[in-house]
Amino acid sequence: MYIRDLDVRDFRSWPELTLRLKPGITLFVGRNGFGKTNIVEAIGYTAHLSSHRVAHDAPLVRQGAHNARISATAVNQGRELTAHLLIKPHAANQAQINRTRLKSPRELLGVVKTVLFSPEDLSLVRGEPAARRQYLDDIIASRTPRLAGVKADYDKVLKQRNALLKSASPSLRRGYSDSDGASALATLDVWDTQLSSLGAQVIQARLALVDELRELIPAAYAGLAPESRPAAIDYKSTVDISDREVIEAMMLTELATKRQREIERGISLVGPHRDDLVLNLGTSPAKGFASHGETWSYAISLRLAEFNLLRQDGTDPILILDDVFAELDAKRREKLVRLAAGAEQVLITAAVDEDLPGNLQPIERFTVTVRDTDEGRISEIAPYTAGGDEDD
């Protein structure tokens, strides 16, 4: 798979951007803050409907604009599809495939597939469980878009259930002693049923994915850090997952067991939103025990496994390397260069030439600069000219 055409309007620092891209390696070089990452962020957004840098869409819309637009034409084994996205910071986003308006942007999932390496990946190892859950859920959504809808529905039910636990806390505490308490408990029962049904599907999908990653991640890590302790992964849940066929029933049982604690605390304590992808080195958790180099190796291993898994499904995802070479030693750089050499399309950003491995063989190269205008600083792009000064 590769992106042939990219058209962006009012996305971050780009009032407009039109690019014709080719298979192979494309470089975007420019100083930090000039907007090169915004280009690959736009492509990544079409793949995941979210940014790897921010949690909400508002920062994606250029200051002073009402919305942002992204159009990306993906070519996959000779078949062309154009994904169109209208990003609205204060309303529901809209999406099209070619000329067909979609009911939900989620219907775009799978049209563009990317695997992105970035400095933010360190949070997969060092950060909170939410980052690791998102890692799993993004892969699941890319491979099985229907399950993205299940996860979205779960999040909605979870939000409603938490709102009930907080707003109706006095009634819930009184229980069946009065009509308000009985009504609140009946409503909570409804949310429990929905949460368990949807949550079981999310957990089962994650467990199936972890089973596939269980060999891929340690193998990738061993290739990067052969002298380190062996890597191992597992899935930790708030629910007994020993019998996958009865996860829904186990969720209901656990919700009943913890109901009083949930009422007291005003939050939902059971479900996949509390789970974690456990990353170990030897017998120790990687978080807190891995060195800086081991942390980078583990983060890269997670992305390598993701890339290989999507490739096994029959499609080479677009490989995005966003400002990562500057952070890596020679061995890890070489591993990524070998991966890049075998991918159908690779998009690389770097601040300066010195950050790039010498054995990269780009097909195209662009220089990203900025210009100050009455509406603020905007990004501009031009094909690289040998001998030019990229800092001008």
Swiss-Prot record:
One of its GO terms (cellular component) is cytoplasm. It is found in: Cytoplasm. One of its GO terms (molecular function) is ATP binding. Coiled coil: none annotated. The keyword Cytoplasm applies. GO terms for biological process: DNA replication; DNA synthesis involved in DNA repair; double-strand break repair; SOS response. ATP binds at G30, R31, N32, G33, F34, G35, K36, T37. Keywords: ATP-binding, Cytoplasm, DNA damage, DNA repair, DNA replication, DNA-binding, Nucleotide-binding, SOS response. NCBIfam families: recf (TIGR00611). The RecF protein is involved in DNA metabolism; it is required for DNA replication and normal SOS inducibility. RecF binds preferentially to single-stranded, linear DNA. It also seems to bind ATP. Belongs to the RecF family. This is DNA replication and repair protein RecF. It comes from Corynebacterium aurimucosum (strain ATCC 700975 / DSM 44827 / CIP 107346 / CN-1) (Corynebacterium nigricans). The lineage of its organism: Bacteria, Bacillati, Actinomycetota, Actinomycetes, Mycobacteriales. The gene is recF.
